[in-house]
C-alpha cells in the first residue's frame, strides 16, 4: 500500500450568546415549546424586514481579534439561495464577498510538545436554520423554527490539519478562546458549537489535493476523532481499489461508527449568492475597533503563565485550570476569599473532577465544567473550615458532594449533620484509651514493631466518634499512650 497523507479543513459554526436573534427580537433561549420563539422575520413572512443585532457584530469582531484576523471594516451580507424545509425564507442571510474577518491563525501545542499554526481563511456572520424532527412511528416530519435566525459565526480554516489530534487541538483552542470572550458557551451537545470536517487524502509528498468530502452530525470531540479515522480509511480503501472518491456531504452515525452519503457537495456558484437588498453595509470605525481590542480578556496562555508566577502553581495544575473559563472563575474567586491557591486547585482537580467523571458515567455524556453550579464561596468556606480544624477531611468531602449536587449552605449542612470536628483533648483521650483497651492484639502488634497497626487504631477511634474526631490529635494521643 502507498503512503497516504490526510488533509483536513474545518468549518466551525458557533452559536453566539446574544439574548435575541440576529435580525429580530425573538429569544435565543435553548429549549422551549416548538415554534414559541418565532415572528414574521425569522419565519420568512412576506414583507418582513431584518434589523441587525449589533451584539452579533461585536462578538464576531472580538473572535476575529482573538484569532489574529484582519477585521473587514466595511462588510456586508449576502443571500445564499437554497430550498430546504427548515429554511422558511428559501435563502440564508450570510456573508460571501466581504466577510467580517479574514486571514487569521491560531497556534496549538500537540501532545509531543510540537507547536503548529492553523490558518483561518475567514470568519463570517450568518443566521441559523430551523430544526427538523422526524417521527418514524407516525411517518411524518415536523419543523421547529425556534432556532431559525439564531446568530452564528462560521470559522473556516485553511486545509492545514494532518491528523485527528491536530483537529482536536485546534477545536479545543477555539472553544477555550471563545468561552473566555463570553461570545458563546460552545456546548457541542446542545449544538452551540458544530464542526463540519472537510477531508481528503493524497500520496505523501504530493502537492495536489484529493477529492474532499464533508462530514456532518459530529456532536463531540470523540465523535469527530472517530469520524476522521473512519473517513480516512474509507477514502484510502476506495483509492486502493481503483475507485473514485465522490465529492459529497456525508452524515456520521456515531452509534454505528460509519457515515453515509446525504447529497452531492455544493460549490459557491450553486447557491446563486447576491448582496442582500434589505440590509445596508456595516462600517466598523477605527474607534469601535480600538474599543473592542481594549476589551479583550486575559486568555488561556497569559492566564496560565500568571497562575504559575503569581500563585506558585505547578505547570500541570495551571494547564488544567485554564482549560476552562469556569474553572478559572471558581479558582480565582475562591482563592480571593480563602487565600489558599494550591488547596483550591487541589479541590478543583481532585474532588470536582472526580464528581464530574461520575456524573458523566451516570448520564452517558461528558459533563463539562461550564455546567458546574456550585459557588466559589462554598468551596472557600470548606477549605477554611478544614484549615481551622472545625471539620476534618472526610466531612469536607461529604459536604462538597452535596455542594456539588445541590449547592447546599455549608454552615447549615455542618450544623444539621453534626459534622463539627471534636478537638477536645479530654473527650478524645477517653475514647482513645477505650480503643486501646478493646484492641490488645493491635496494641501488641504495634509494640512488636508493626508500626502500621496504629492506622487500625486510628480508624477504630474515628469510628467510635462517628468520624468527627481530629485525626491528627488521635494519632498523637495513640503514640503518647502506646509508648
From Swiss-Prot:
Gene3D superfamilies: 1.10.10.410, GatB domain, N-terminal subdomain (1.10.150.380). Its EC number is 6.3.5.-. The keyword ATP-binding applies. One of its GO terms (biological process) is glutaminyl-tRNAGln biosynthesis via transamidation. NCBIfam families: gatB (TIGR00133), PRK05477.1-2 (NF004012), PRK05477.1-4 (NF004014). HAMAP family: GatB. Belongs to the GatB/GatE family. GatB subfamily. This is Aspartyl/glutamyl-tRNA(Asn/Gln) amidotransferase subunit B. The lineage of its organism: Bacteria, Bacillati, Bacillota, Clostridia, Lachnospirales.
